[in-house]
């Protein structure tokens, strides 16, 4: 077996306990990667202990964490690991993932960690265009995306995307976050000056899980939907994770290919 034949792809995700969105997002990303690179075995790891434990208890589904996956890769005789994270940004989750992966580096010839969804200028522009093509908001509506938000410096990506929407002429597309400075409350003043016929909410997250179901579109008083309706706006919600969008999944394929190309250069 040649060196590159001992290569595997490890897809690392935060995870979700919502089966429907898991199949449409994480599993679809994995499927696309498998079909794009069928010569390499594909492994999966999730980083959320809470979600992994919930799936184990509720559904009897065991999903490996990073340590288990890296140990399994070694046991299977894999010598080169190309890691493709399914994170949107390179934040705290990404930092922790890299630390755990690289703790096993001594067990392999090469460990390549590919980019998260949005790292380069091209990535961000491609996601911007993908969102516009997927949702194509009407001229009298506001399309407000719910990102996660973080205290990490990578949080700058969210206002950057908001500006990018405007740069490409999508003046009615806006970005907000569950955490951080881009909250729904901070958006309300801006909204009053826009006078939309209605507001369309959609998640800017790989999966349409707990945040999309509860924080965005839930019936509790503190959901974005409820807050906007209380202000008198007509609101519609789309529970579609970024992972459902082909153009988004294509970016992950591109990043994995770049990782495999780097590995080929190292092995040359």
Model-derived features with residue positions:
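Active-site-proximal alpha-helix that buttresses catalytic centers in soluble enzyme cores
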Residues: 1-268
């Amino acid at each position: 077996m040649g060196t590159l034949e001992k290569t595997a792809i490890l897809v690392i995700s935060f995870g979700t306990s919502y089966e429907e969105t898991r199949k449409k997002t994480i599993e679809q990303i994995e499927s696309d990667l498998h079909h794009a690179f069928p010569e390499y075995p594909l492994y999966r790891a999730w980083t959320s202990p809470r979600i992994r434990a919930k799936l184990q208890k509720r559904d009897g589904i065991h999903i490996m964490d990073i340590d288990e996956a890296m140990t399994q890769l070694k046991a299977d005789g894999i010598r080169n690991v190309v890691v493709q994270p399914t994170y949107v940004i390179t934040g705290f989750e990404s930092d922790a993932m890299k630390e755990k992966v690289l703790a096993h580096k001594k067990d392999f010839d090469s460990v390549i960690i590919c980019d998260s969804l949005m790292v380069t200028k091209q990535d961000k522009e491609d996601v911007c265009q993908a969102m516009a093509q997927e949702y194509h908001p009407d001229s009298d509506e506001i399309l407000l995306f719910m990102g996660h938000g973080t205290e990490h410096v990578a949080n700058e990506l969210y206002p950057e995307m908001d500006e990018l929407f405007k740069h490409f002429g999508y003046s009615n597309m806006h970005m907000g976050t569950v955490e951080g400075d881009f909250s729904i409350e901070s958006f309300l003043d801006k909204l009053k000056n826009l006078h939309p016929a209605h507001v369309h909410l959609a998640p800017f997250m790989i999966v349409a899980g707990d945040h999309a179901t509860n924080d965005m579109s839930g019936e509790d008083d503190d959901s974005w939907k409820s807050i906007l309706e209380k202000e008198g706006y007509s609101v519609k919600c789309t529970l579609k994770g970024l992972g459902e969008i082909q153009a988004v999944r294509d970016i992950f394929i591109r990043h994995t290919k770049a990782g495999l190309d780097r590995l080929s250069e190292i092995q040359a």
